[in-house]
Amino acid sequence: MGCELDLPVTRTTLSVLACSPYFLAFAGAVSAFPKTAPKANLTSMTRLLSPSTTDRDYWAIVDNLTRRGFFGVGAGVAAAAFLAACGSTESSTPENAETFEFTRGDEKLIIPTDPQNVVALDPRDGLELSILAGYPVTAYPTGAAEHLRREVPDATGVEIFAEGASDPNFEYISTLGADLLVLSAGWWDTGSYGNDRMQQIAPVLPVGKDFTPEWRKVMSDFLTGIGRSDRAEEVLAEYDAHVAQVRPTVEPLMAGKKVAFVAAAEDQIAWFQNDFRTAVAEDLGFEVLREGPDLRVMLGSEQFNRLEEADVIFALDRSASGSVYTSPTWQRLPAAQAGRVIPFDYYKAAGYALTAKVLVDDLAAGVKR
């Protein structure tokens, strides 16, 4: 398959040479060509990653205390780069698309400046940060939360596909015509998504840090990195204004009281002490029950008494075979006896400004019950 060239015939670039059967013969002449010649678009060859810590899904939350993924890929040799430019799978990014360098940790990624067909490959980080960036989202997974679905512009024309982050359907994704694929950095950094194959379809932008209490910074850094710092300021101002409106209605109810956030996992409880939820709760003036700086700790039924100081417990239950919330040790907790165990929505357990805003309402409604 040949390369499509968008350069004047009087200009020659490395991409021309890469597509020519006479590449070796002409290689020595490269330095003679004008230095002002347009650069070849190497977006589809970008393979840049950086480490991050994330929780991939609910069971990673409750069953895996330290799931970390580090997948580093160095730059390939020049010959491999030239072959990639004319490979059998073309990137759907137009070769004349304007791109820029996005810094992620110590790595650099080349992405379109103004993508027109963005596919969010995961329903949390990828979708929410794409929406916040103002990207035209044209497809996203079925697992997306309702509050995010409502935010997708022109939602009636958007493709919704079956979620399968651990086993993506590359053939289907390649039919979506994406010029940018956005997904959770956690999936990307573990390499479990099929990174090489993804990059043959379109440039990939790994984003976010799932469940982080520092969601403001993560979101702001991302939006600033793509040149949309004004958007970060805008959505944070909207969130802070909403908190300022709701906080006076709940502070009197929660004065001198503590809240805890937990999730059931068969015969254990994951007690979340420093995450997205606790950060939003503290914005509302709630005192969060915690024992240390860890994201979470696991409690067996004999340790449930460590939650006795919680006046209100927000509890998530996605266990497969019965709930520990019916156990005698759980039922003896003061919050359980007082009917102050509030069901929690899984889809609001992590996120950024959009999710934080609706979480404020959920937390307020919970303590007003």
Region roles according to the model:
Residues 86-95:
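Bacterial lipoprotein signal-peptidase II cleavage site
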Residues 3-7, 19-65, 76-84:
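N-terminal secretory signal peptides
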Residues 117-119, 124-176, 180:
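A short, structured surface patch at a secondary-structure boundary
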Residues 177-183, 309-310:
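Proline-aspartate-enriched helix->loop->beta-strand connector
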Residues 117-130, 231-287:
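Basic- and aromatic-lined ligand-binding clefts that recognize polyanionic substrates
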Residues 148, 187-193, 208-222, 256-278, ...:
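Extracytoplasmic ligand-binding site segments that recognize negatively charged/polar headgroups
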Residues 307-369:
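Structured C-terminal subdomain patch of bacterial secreted/periplasmic proteins
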Residues 195-263, 356-369:
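Extracytoplasmic substrate-binding proteins
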